[in-house]
């Protein structure tokens, strides 16, 4: 088989970078913060957590305050404000301020899953990656990818 070389432009729906065809996905991201009180009740009694030594985290079993940091990456399908990120951020912040979403005593993973549930209704059929951390220090990152054909 011979390679065909032409000076004519070739247009693809994907992108050619460094002479290799790649599949391109674009994302926007927004960040916001919410103050919250939570606890991890099992930490007070689980022997793996309430160790009584330098690994002890039994204090997590009592209510304690954090500034929860959120970062939401959302797939977009064109580069001209498919989703306006300032509006998306305001919508997400409002979900917490009006009580549609609540922090309660939830883990970072639970908060990320709850936030995905709301995002996927507001902006459906997109891939998401959501990060939630306690004070910007420790947290989770969960990717939600659409299943082909659904």
Regions inferred by a protein language model and the residue ranges of each:
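Charge-rich, low-complexity N-terminal segments
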Residues: 1-150
